[in-house]
A protein has these predicted regions:
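Short coil/turn segments at secondary-structure boundaries
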Residues: 1, 23-32, 250-252, 260-264, ...
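Extended, non-catalytic substrate-recognition/exosite surfaces adjacent to catalytic cores, especially
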Residues: 1-217, 221-223, 235, 278-290, ...
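Acidic/polar loop patches that form or flank catalytic/metal-binding clefts of enzymes
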Residues: 24, 199-206, 271, 302-307, ...
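Structural recognition of the beta-strand scaffold that forms the well-ordered cores
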Residues: 148-149, 158-160, 202-203, 236, ...
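Active-site-proximal loop and beta-strand segments within enzyme catalytic domains
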Residues: 195-234, 239-243, 251-258, 264, ...
């Protein structure tokens, strides 16, 4: 098998902790039940089943409360306590994704007779063995998610966590859940633009778009902030996940071209020939999307995810090998044991190294300056993209180092909103960040390879032109020879100004916007709006 036990443990832990963090952020759902504290309370407590497959959780009954401590009895006949600081997270969950005020005492959360789930805390005073055991108030998340980690050079799946608990649900959300990726699909739209001759500095008009879709009526996509920003470099469009820029870009390039690009990465069959596909309206699995990102990470070479390296029969004979390449210099009379082995690279190229490098640079900007800032690891090169769908039903973060590609999805199995201000940057990205931080010592990344022949010019991040002396907001941009921008370059979508009825006030072109400071983006807008 390809699974690495250490990485698998990290994946399970990062996913579980991330789901629990989200769940607690949305409040306390209340006690499992209540029971009368009569002479038979212990027998009544034993009738409750502990959470399946979650060994560190126990069922307990609240026996007595004080303002600072709840005293509990457990199913194994022992007793313990929950201190206020270990339940103060439990703000009451209200309707419509709202939560109540922070509790001020234990009685604001628990009452005698409540049946609850608890988790034992480490004994910080091990020198006092008879000290009553201390617990934290807990609840099992009703949200779920998935994480998968792939070696981008081979396609080997190194870790796969298909949900919070396999005992609770055997549904594997890595391979079986088909969900809308939202803005996580955007790198392939921007790659199509690069292949069409545009650059990360090409200006795209960020302005209202109205699309008449037969059978659906008018579709009016929006940026998350509801604001518009005027002509902005393509890099900004990806870093800040600007929907209006992406739609204009897709309309300019053509959705057929975009689907053709996505098809090389195994995603074309998931996209419909409509502009909504540019914002992630088609459904994918986490494994499909992460495999596509792995092809960006590895330099633009096609890979297929694999779970098995070799298969042997009961006599030890090899009957299957996933990688059938042979090192010709390693066998025969001319084999040199001192020379490192060289395996032929037979992988199909799916992206030109130049355009792939430009895209990776832009995706690094997502982590450094954009919607994925929560995964930033100082001094460690990472690239990726957030994704959040309409009404925040799905949250994604897919990203990579030079040696590891990781995808995270979070959502309810029966889709419903994750809540206000919840999305790829706030829900999925922290899970990715924790896993990547812990996995780095095992698979450290290196700077992404730069193909020869590119020209590097420092440009102004706001207007895409070569930086002038004194410009502060700049970025070192990579260009193919002859593509360095000038003031005479066209703005994609600028001709559509005449259809807006009036010029957009320049005061709305505010770069210090909510789109930039919120770690979230919205993708597919309701077509009936």
């Amino acid at each position: 098998a390809t699974i690495d036990p250490k990485l698998q443990h990290m994946a399970d832990t990062a996913l579980a902790d991330g789901l629990e963090t989200y769940d607690r952020r949305h409040g306390w759902r209340g006690a499992i039940s209540t029971l009368p504290l009569d002479d038979n309370w212990f027998d009544s407590l034993k009738k409750y089943k502990p959470p399946l497959g979650i060994l560190d959780r126990q069922i307990a009954a609240v026996i007595r409360t004080t303002p600072k401590v709840a005293y509990i009895g457990l199913q194994d006949g022992t007793y313990g306590s929950i201190h206020f600081e270990d339940l103060k997270w439990a703000r009451k969950r209200l309707k419509r994704q709202r939560i109540g005020p922070s509790p001020k005492s234990v009685s604001d959360v628990l009452s005698p007779g409540d049946v609850v789930t608890v988790r034992e805390l480490p004994n910080i005073q091990e020198d006092i063995p008879d000290l009553p055991r201390r617990y934290s108030l807990d609840q099992i998340p009703n949200i779920d998610g998935a994480l998968v980690a792939i070696d981008p050079h081979t396609g080997r799946v190194l870790a796969m966590s298909g949900g919070y608990s396999a005992d609770r649900s055997q549904f594997n959300r890595v391979t079986q859940a088909n969900r809308q990726p939202g803005s996580a699909i955007k790198p392939f739209i921007y790659l199509s633009a690069l292949e069409a001759g545009h650059t990360p500095a090409t200006l795209i008009l960020d302005a209202p778009v109205v699309v008449n879709i037969p059978g659906y009526g008018l579709w009016k996509p929006q940026n998350y902030s509801g604001k518009i920003y005027g002509p902005s470099p393509m890099r900004i469009g990806l870093e800040k996940s600007r929907n209006l820029m992406t739609i204009r870009l897709a309309e300019y390039i053509g959705i057929d071209k975009i689907i053709s690009t996505a098809d090389r990465f195994g995603l074309g069959q998931r996209m419909r020939p409509e502009l909504g596909s540019a914002l992630g309206s088609g459904e994918v699995t986490l494994l499909e999307l992460t495999s596509a990102y792995a092809m960006i990470a590895n330099g633009g070479l096609k890979i297929s995810p694999s779970f098995i390296d070799t298969v042997h029969d009961r006599n030890g004979n090899l009957i299957f090998r996933h990688d059938n390449r042979k090192c010709q210099e390693c066998i025969g009379p001319n084999a040199d044991p001192l020379m490192p082995p060289e395996l032929p690279n037979k992988k199909e190229r799916v992206a030109d190294p130049f355009y792939r490098y430009q895209l990776v640079s832009m995706m690094q900007g997502v982590v450094e300056n954009g919607t994925g800032r929560r995964v930033k690891l100082t001094g460690r090169p990472l690239a990726g993209k957030t994704g959040t769908t309409n009404k925040s039903l799905d949250a994604w973060f897919v990203g990579f180092s030079s040696n590891l590609t990781v995808g995270v999805f979070v959502g309810f199995d029966q889709p419903r909103t994750l809540g206000p201000r919840e999305g790829g940057g706030s829900v999925a990205a922290p899970i990715f960040g924790r896993f990547m931080r812990e996995a780095w010592p095992i698979l450290p990344g290196a700077p992404f390879k730069t193909p020869p022949g590119l020209e590097f010019v420092r440009v102004n991040r706001l207007n895409g032109l070569p930086a002038k002396q004194g410009d502060k907001n700049t970025v070192l941009e990579a260009f193919l020879p002859g593509t360095i921008p000038s003031a005479n370059d066209n703005v994609i979508g600028a001709g559509l100004y005449e259809n807006l009825g009036e010029m957009i006030p320049s005061i709305l072109f505010d770069e210090d916007s909510d789109d930039e400071v919120r770690e979230q983006d919205i993708s597919v807008q309701d077509r009936t709006n």
